[in-house]
């Protein structure tokens, strides 16, 4: 398991407006899940089978 920290520089208010989120917490949750899916997809595309988690699995 390799821990990775990822920072996304985005206009959160614009993201909230564009996707109709109620507030910043739901928008941040969506961004985290989107980033997780993209990383997992790109690793699979490169031929690596990996499960990407937002938190360390127990």
From Swiss-Prot:
Organismal lineage: Viruses, Duplodnaviria, Heunggongvirae, Uroviricota, Caudoviricetes
Gene name for this UniProt entry: 72
Protein's name in the database: Gene 72 protein
């Amino acid at each position: 398991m390799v821990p990775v920290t990822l920072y996304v520089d985005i206009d959160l208010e614009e993201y909230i407006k564009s996707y109709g989120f109620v507030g910043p917490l739901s928008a941040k949750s969506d961004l985290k899940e989107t980033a997780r899916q993209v990383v997992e997809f790109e690793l699979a595309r490169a031929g690596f089978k990996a499960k990407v988690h937002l938190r360390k699995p127990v």
